[in-house]
Amino acid sequence: MEINKIYCMDCLEGMKQLKDKTVDVVVTSPPYNIGIKYNKYSDNLSREDYLNWIEEVVKEIKRVLKDDGSFFINVGYTAKDPWIAFDVANVIRKHFKLQNTIHWVKSIAIQKEDVGNYPNIIGDIAVGHYKPINSDRFLSIMHEYIFHFTKNGNVKLDKLAIGVPYQDKSNIKRFNRKGDLRDRGNTWFIPYETIQSKEKERPHPATFPPKLPEMCIKLHGVKKTNLVLDPFMGIGSTAIACIRLGIDYIGFEIDEYYCRVAEERIKKELLKTDGKFDNVKNKNIITLDAFI
């Protein structure tokens, strides 16, 4: 199969056509099986059928992933079904080691008194987007999980590639650091971009922002990443992240409409470069191969 394409087909059939140990990083987000309304996919399988299906996908991912590769999987949950993310992780643990658990924070509120005495923070902070829960029992859900799996649990990461500056600059000298960056940790605040029309700008009901796969790839290490796979490409966020980083990608998406949206998003992303995107390895990028 050719790289830098999104194949509009079932990911199990697609991955079977990939060679063993050819992928450096997998970043994906499968259907959560929590009743989300997709165009073509039923998100209401029995728990047993859903987890069996997830395991078949995971087996193929393990086959195509290099021994020193990283597998990042984003899984959400609902207040009524809080265990689904852990059930998915428990299936994957049969085949991979859980190296890191990352919390994708979509919205956060911090009172000034809890921040400390920093001159650049002058008031309370409340930023991000979330879907409020109308309930007197459940809290609104502000985060999802990103499970980082590897084959052996010992893949070295480029933590400072997604590092953050020290608030207290005296820590740079105190900890004998070479620069003003520290480990971000496992809480990643990645808000959605503000949009005017969800139907036009974010038609997929459960997509992540391109910054999420971009950070996953950077954490694994851009220099050692040649090919990224997303088995559930959706509207192309992982492909966009790869284009921005100059890394080859391949993906699968069963829904024809989402494939076409992905194609348009990728075209717009390439136009933003104004012909100066010299780090794209394959300039002849074709996003769709065929509708099956």
Curated annotation (Swiss-Prot):
Which Gene Ontology BP terms does the record give?
DNA restriction-modification system; methylation
Q: Which reaction does it catalyse?
A: a 2'-deoxycytidine in DNA + S-adenosyl-L-methionine = an N(4)-methyl-2'-deoxycytidine in DNA + S-adenosyl-L-homocysteine + H(+)
Gene3D superfamilies documented for this protein: Vaccinia Virus protein VP39
A GO cellular component term found in this entry reads: cytoplasm
Which is one GO molecular function term here? N-methyltransferase activity
EC primary class: transferase
Report the domain of life of the source organism: Archaea
Q: What is its EC number?
A: 2.1.1.113
Q: Pfam families, from UniProt?
A: N6_N4_Mtase
What keywords appear on the UniProt entry?
Answer: DNA-binding, Methyltransferase, Restriction system, S-adenosyl-L-methionine, Transferase
What family, per the record? Belongs to the N(4)/N(6)-methyltransferase family. N(4) subfamily.
User: What is the protein's name according to its record?
Assistant: Type II methyltransferase M.MjaV
- Top-down, what is the taxonomic lineage of the species of origin? Archaea, Methanobacteriati, Methanobacteriota, Methanomada group, Methanococci
